[in-house]
């Protein structure tokens, strides 16, 4: 999605159209993690006329970078839409999502560790909606004691998240959504562009 945003932003810049960038200012501080999203985010913010940030920290990131566009803190529209789902529960489920390209070369190691956990804690249902990328799919045979699902619509994924006791993920969005529903999220990445979740104890 950041690639699509960057492509549209660059086209608008070339056509001298105004650019309004939603979810601006997320930063990990490492161009390789997440890759290529971190680079796209920095480049879009540089050419945007208006940057809409979700938090004070993300706004401060843009101030530190001395971007030329205006900066407005507007909150997170994704989380606004989660209110309609109601209150979460806490069942013996653990939701897993792993897909990031910087994780592809050790995806088999991640899956082996998940399989070990599923064997060690059989009273939990480990659930993974597996990503369609071939670099992920080729390792699905490792997951013999894990409930492997085909990719889910967002609303169905959120329903499982709301019932889960724990989330294990390399997703940026699930860090936000898990924190919103007061779930603990184990982040399978070297860094995160959402440090607010660390300060609240969810990540």
Report each predicted region and the residues it spans:
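Nucleotide-activated sugar donor-binding and catalytic core shared by glycosyltransferases
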Residues: 1-128, 133-203
């Amino acid at each position: 999605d950041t690639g699509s945003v960057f492509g549209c932003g660059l086209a608008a810049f070339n056509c001298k159209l105004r650019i309004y960038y939603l979810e601006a200012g997320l930063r990990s501080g490492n161009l390789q993690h997440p890759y290529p999203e971190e680079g796209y985010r920095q480049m879009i913010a540089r050419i945007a006329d208006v940057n809409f940030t979700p938090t004070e920290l993300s706004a401060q990131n843009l101030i530190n970078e001395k971007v030329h566009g205006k900066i407005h803190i507007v909150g997170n529209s994704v989380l606004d839409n989660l209110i309609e789902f109601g209150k979460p529960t806490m069942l013996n489920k653990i939701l897993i999502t792993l897909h990031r390209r910087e994780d592809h070369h050790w995806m088999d190691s991640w899956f082996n560790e998940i399989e070990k956990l599923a064997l060690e804690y059989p009273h939990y249902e480990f659930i993974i909606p597996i990503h369609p990328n071939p670099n992920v799919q080729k390792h699905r045979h490792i997951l013999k004691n894990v409930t492997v699902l085909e990719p889910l619509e967002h609303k169905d994924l959120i329903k499982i998240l709301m019932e889960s006791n724990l989330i294990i993920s390399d997703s940026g969005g699930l860090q936000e959504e898990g924190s919103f529903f007061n779930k603990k999220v184990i982040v399978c990445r070297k860094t995160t562009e959402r440090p607010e979740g660390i300060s609240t104890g969810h990540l």
